[in-house]
Amino acid sequence: MYLTQDLELFHEYTVTQLLFKDVKNATELRKMAVNGEIKGALINPSMVVDAFQILVATNKAVHLHKIGKMKTRSLYSEIIFNLSPTNNISEAFKRFGISDSDTAVHIVLVHNKEETLNIDDIISKVDGQQIDVGQVSEMTDTAKIKKLYKITPQEDKCGTLLDAVVCRMAIKDVA
């Protein structure tokens, strides 16, 4: 149901992703995240192509956190910001964070391997149905993603949407 992976460059950290549909309490979840009651990034799954996209954003966020160069105030807000192709923080939250009307949520948790993570506590806060993280592609709004990341038809023919999105995320700070 959920996906837990170690970060290759930061062996002491583990990333856990959870996906929910038919969520009825997005407003409360968003408020809990803002207040620090949920220590995780709450992401709109319609803007996610694959769990790997989240892993890339998380890896970059942990790296920036460790070297003290984050552009946002927390590790979890940095994950959301890293998903965006632009450097506008508020736009990143509007497009990639959850809104009060959302009925699905992709939760990303980052934890030290030595810490115990109570996944059941997070799951109990969500009034919705947990589904396998691999199903995130079924929720993807492909047209919206292509428009936001400016994916050309030529690029679409020669590579995958995931490759194009991850490339845009990677070069954001360079371009």
Curated annotation (Swiss-Prot):
<dbReference type="InterPro" id="IPR036504">
    <property type="entry name" value="CGI121/TPRKB_sf"/>
</dbReference>
<dbReference type="GO" id="GO:0005634">
    <property type="term" value="C:nucleus"/>
</dbReference>
<dbReference type="GO" id="GO:0000408">
    <property type="term" value="C:EKC/KEOPS complex"/>
</dbReference>
<keyword id="KW-0963">Cytoplasm</keyword>
<comment type="function">
    <text>Component of the EKC/KEOPS complex that is required for the formation of a threonylcarbamoyl group on adenosine at position 37 (t(6)A37) in tRNAs that read codons beginning with adenine. The complex is probably involved in the transfer of the threonylcarbamoyl moiety of threonylcarbamoyl-AMP (TC-AMP) to the N6 group of A37. Tprkb acts as an allosteric effector that regulates the t(6)A activity of the complex.</text>
</comment>
<dbReference type="GO" id="GO:0002949">
    <property type="term" value="P:tRNA threonylcarbamoyladenosine modification"/>
</dbReference>
<dbReference type="InterPro" id="IPR013926">
    <property type="entry name" value="CGI121/TPRKB"/>
</dbReference>
<keyword id="KW-0539">Nucleus</keyword>
<protein>
    <recommendedName>
        <fullName>EKC/KEOPS complex subunit TPRKB</fullName>
    </recommendedName>
</protein>
<comment type="similarity">
    <text>Belongs to the CGI121/TPRKB family.</text>
</comment>
<dbReference type="Pfam" id="PF08617">
    <property type="entry name" value="CGI-121"/>
</dbReference>
<dbReference type="GO" id="GO:0005829">
    <property type="term" value="C:cytosol"/>
</dbReference>
<comment type="subunit">
    <text>Component of the EKC/KEOPS complex.</text>
</comment>
<dbReference type="GO" id="GO:0005737">
    <property type="term" value="C:cytoplasm"/>
</dbReference>
<keyword id="KW-0819">tRNA processing</keyword>
